[in-house]
UniProtKB/Swiss-Prot annotation:
Domain HTH tetR-type: 8-68
Keywords: DNA-binding, Repressor, Transcription, Transcription regulation
Gene Ontology molecular functions: DNA-binding transcription factor activity; transcription cis-regulatory region binding
Lineage, highest ranks first: Bacteria, Pseudomonadati, Pseudomonadota, Alphaproteobacteria, Hyphomicrobiales
Matches recorded under InterPro entries: BetI_C (IPR039538), DNA-bd_HTH_TetR-type_CS (IPR023772), Homeodomain-like_sf (IPR009057), HTH-type_TetR-like_transc_reg (IPR050109), HTH_TetR (IPR001647), Tet_transcr_reg_TetR-rel_C_sf (IPR036271), Tscrpt_rep_BetI (IPR017757)
Name assigned to this protein: HTH-type transcriptional regulator BetI
Pfam families attached to this UniProt entry: TetR_C_6, TetR_N
Function description: Repressor involved in the biosynthesis of the osmoprotectant glycine betaine. It represses transcription of the choline transporter BetT and the genes of BetAB involved in the synthesis of glycine betaine.
Top-level taxonomic group: Bacteria
Gene: betI
Amino acid sequence: MPKIEMEPLRRRELIDAAIRTIGQRGSLDVTVAQIAHEAGVSPALAHHYFGGKDKLILATMRHLLRELGRDLNAAIKQANTPHERIAAIIAVNFSAAQFAQETIAAWLTFYVHAQQSDDIKRLLRIYARRLHSNLVFALEQLTSRARANRIAEGAGAMIDGLYIRHALGADAPDAASAIALVEDYIAIQLSGQPSAEN
């Protein structure tokens, strides 16, 4: 395969290896050599593509955000009503790709290290804003703007909390149960509220 075609493949392999390595260790205290070994490439090649561990970690976070955004956009395009849009947003956050054990562990590790890294904190804020705005867009068609913001805030907190619960392992809700819990929360919050469509 020509070198120009190999670079995106190698970059993706290293990012996938970073997710696995961070997830397995539950820490960003990993080395480029460990990630490269997991990817089956040399540390020199990893440094060549990313220029160091910090840039590789940030590239991994950006990749996770892009994947989530891509999956979310595809799901939302299939939604025809506000309720379908809300269901799509929730389902994507608990899809097999997003709710995988190593991916969850990587996300939680990023949250911990956001306290020391402005770059990681900025990317996590981007994620939170996107989730919130997507939920509000659908919810404000069903209730007031203020109420939509409050429900979206609660739903976002539930999603984050369910990721933490799942990372704990035993007795944690599976994806289907997690989806049902968030959907039930939103339905209860909307019940009895005057619809914006009326």
